[in-house]
Amino acid sequence: MNSKTWENCASAYLQHLKAAGRAKGTIRIHRYYLQVMRGIAPCPGLVSRERLEAWLAGHDWKPETRRSAQGVAHQFFKFLVEDGILKDSPAKFLKPVHVPDGVPHPAPESAVKNALQNAPKRTALMVRFAALCGLRACEICTLQGNAWDGELLRVKGKGGRVRVIPLQDSTLIYSLESCPGWLFPGRIDGHLSAQYTAKLLGSVLPPGVTGHSLRHRFGTVAYRATHDLLAVGAVMGHVKT
């Protein structure tokens, strides 16, 4: 059993992710779960499959969150094995988390119209990017003026993957062309956080409608217009794994 501390192991693992060019948002998520994971045992070397399963079962998480937490555990302990810190991974034989197929809940047009008319200027702009471009909160908050090349908007999505989106909305085009830096400046690496962006979006939408519902609205409208599921999926940044 190796007695290296959580701090030592987590620091080495996060450096490993950074060296591999993983997105800042991805590293932030991994750091969060590693912090939560520290309650499993005094050090990573004392974590067993049973303790790991008890930790996962002890949280009232949604399936997507549970899968994310388990994924971090898999990658973290695999790294410790590869680095010679552990002989075997306690996450090796965890059963995969079942995540039911998601059902789209597009925002009603009335909700979109009301938000665009009544929301503060900054939040209304966020609504436009979500409803008209299908951007996630984590993509909206990191937008910069130079992401627009005059024809296409380049968006860095999940896992640092870049996709291009055609823009026709004059308000969005003007906002990008008149912005030399971050479109939504803040305290997280110079821009707003995804969590705060999602909160702002939710604040101008009716109960039961979220910022992600605006993204679903975009997907629904785009599919109705094209009937091309692959093209819509590419614009929205859906990735097959």
Annotate each predicted stretch with a short phrase.
Residues S11-V103:
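N-terminal core-binding DNA-recognition domain of tyrosine recombinases/integrases
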Residues L86, H98-D101, H105-A137, C141, ...:
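Basic, Lys/Arg- and aromatic-enriched nucleic-acid-binding interface segment
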Residues F129-A130, L143, V221-A225, V235:
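Short alpha-helical segment immediately N-terminal to, or the first helix within
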Residues C133, T142-S175:
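Conserved tyrosine-mediated DNA breakage-rejoining catalytic core shared by Y-recombinases
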Residues A147-G150, G208, H227-T241:
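Short, polar N-cap/turn motifs at the start of nucleic acid-interacting alpha helices
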Residues Q168-G208, H212:
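Active-site/catalytic core of tyrosine-dependent DNA strand-transfer enzymes
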Residues P207-T226, V239:
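Short basic/aromatic active-site micro-motif
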